[in-house]
Amino acid sequence: MGHYAPDGAYPEGIGYWDYGTSFNAMFLSAIEKAFGTDYGLSELPGFLKTGEYILHAVTPNLKNFAYSDNGGTAFLAPTMFWFYDKTKDASILYNQVQLYKKDGQKRIKKNRLAPAMLIWGASASLANPQKPVRLSWKAQGDNPVCFMRSSWNDSSAVYVGMKMGSPSVNHGHMDVGSFLLEADGVLWGMDMGGEEYNR
């Protein structure tokens, strides 16, 4: 869990965040239910901040900032409901609600952890999602990132995502310094993301 330090960015990108972090959340949820504590694991540096990484890595038109081996399609992430449950920050679910409104039934059918949203999100009010306050977010770590946007509720908003770091992290590419620019609903510049493993 040290890879989330210090600010919550995940070095392998947003898709591998979903895969790896979902196992962390399931484990922490299980031991907390069984023993009444997670033994401080959720308090490790950066871990409770990593939900903000996913929140800010999604563009106004619900695309991912795809660097390393990651694709550009945003996805429903049930683990974000775990972060809501732990932090009680309703704004962390903003993009999740937008994704569900767009084509939620299809997304839920394809997600093995969708039932966990019912448990972790039981107290969430999803009818009117709380808009996040911060228009920018940055994180240090193995692959530092920075995300900026002009608005949360305007699909024509300007959005910029930037990635620094190292190509030697797991699933890394030679993409240090890559960026994504979205404005007026158009992706003007982006990292092409990952290729198929078998090519």
Describe every region a protein language model picked out.
Residues 1-12:
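Acidic/His metal-coordination segments adjacent to aromatic residues that form catalytic metal sites
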Residues 8, 65, 195:
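Flexible, active-site-adjacent loop/turn segments at secondary-structure boundaries
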Residues 12, 17, 197:
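Short, electropositive, low-hydrophobicity segments enriched in small/polar residues
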Residues 16-189:
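Carbohydrate-active enzyme catalytic cores, enriched for enzymes
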Residues 189-199:
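C-terminal, non-catalytic macromolecule-binding modules
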